[in-house]
Swiss-Prot record:
The gene is adk. Keywords: ATP-binding, Cytoplasm, Kinase, Nucleotide biosynthesis, Nucleotide-binding, Transferase. Residues 33-62 are annotated as: NMP. GO terms for cellular component: cytoplasm; cytosol. Consists of three domains, a large central CORE domain and two small peripheral domains, NMPbind and LID, which undergo movements during catalysis. The LID domain closes over the site of phosphoryl transfer upon ATP binding. Assembling and dissambling the active center during each catalytic cycle provides an effective means to prevent ATP hydrolysis. Catalyzes the reversible transfer of the terminal phosphate group between ATP and AMP. Plays an important role in cellular energy homeostasis and in adenine nucleotide metabolism. GO terms for biological process: AMP salvage; nucleoside diphosphate metabolic process; nucleoside monophosphate metabolic process. This is Adenylate kinase. InterPro entries: Adenyl_kin_sub (IPR006259), Adenylat/UMP-CMP_kin (IPR000850), Adenylat_kinase_CS (IPR033690), P-loop_NTPase (IPR027417). Residues 129-161 are annotated as: LID. Pathway: Purine metabolism; AMP biosynthesis via salvage pathway; AMP from ADP: step 1/1. It comes from Fusobacterium nucleatum subsp. nucleatum (strain ATCC 25586 / DSM 15643 / BCRC 10681 / CIP 101130 / JCM 8532 / KCTC 2640 / LMG 13131 / VPI 4355).
């Protein structure tokens, strides 16, 4: 079996995190998210972590060169030898090129790019329908998983689950991601999957691709 060096793409609410967990559980490879890498580096007070902390404490975005350095360090770790899933990176073509350079130095390359395709209208319905109970903390969906024992006044919508915010996030995702997918399509690495199917069917589609 080839090394499972994967990039997983999907808009917010496409089910990317859920599918990544299934891949991790089945193949025993780590899920690599830039957010997690940053948190660990800051907690461990590494050189790059301390640099990143200055920007995070100031409420600023951590510059690409620091993030790229942290990604390079993470991919060189032993648990990535048999593969990994990149989650939330690369977000743009510049980062995709840097990722290729990092992997080339490690004698690796991205083997497969999986894109979960879900129409925007479905994403909006999935996210804007989410409600959280102020009492129990449980998360519901007004259509797909409606609450039975909760009072309506106890259910709240998160600020970033409003339609206005979701539409903006989708615009950003499409503007950034379309060129990255094109970058990998030229390399013949992209497989697109229908993300509107049943959860288990999507998982099986992914497993068939990975072998």
């Amino acid at each position: 079996m080839i090394n499972l060096n994967l990039v997983l793409f999907g808009a917010p609410g496409a089910g990317k995190g859920t599918q990544a967990k299934f891949i991790v559980d089945k193949y025993g490879i780590p899920q690599i998210s830039t957010g997690d890498i940053l948190r660990v580096a800051v907690a461990n007070k590494t050189k790059l972590g301390l640099e990143a902390k200055k920007f995070m404490d100031a409420g600023q975005l951590v510059p690409d060169e620091i993030v790229n350095g942290l990604v390079a360090e993470r991919l060189a770790e032993k648990d990535c030898e048999k593969g990994f899933i990149m989650d939330g990176f690369p977000r743009n073509v510049a980062q995709a090129k840097v990722l290729d350079e990092i992997l080339t130095k490690l004698g690796k390359q991205i083997e497969k790019v999986i894109a979960l395709n879900v129409p925007d209208k479905d994403i909006i319905e999935r996210i804007t329908g989410r409600r959280t109970s102020k009492v129990t903390g449980k998360i519901y969906h007004i259509k797909f998983n409606p609450p039975v024992d909760e009072k309506p006044e106890d259910l709240v919508q998160r600020a970033d689950d409003t339609e206005e915010v979701v539409v903006k996030r989708l615009e950003t995702y499409h503007n950034q991601t379309a060129p990255v997918l094109d970058y990998y399509k030229v390399q013949n690495k992209v497989t697109e999957i229908d993300g509107t199917k049943k959860l288990e069917d999507i998982t099986q589609d992914i497993f068939k691709i990975l072998g």
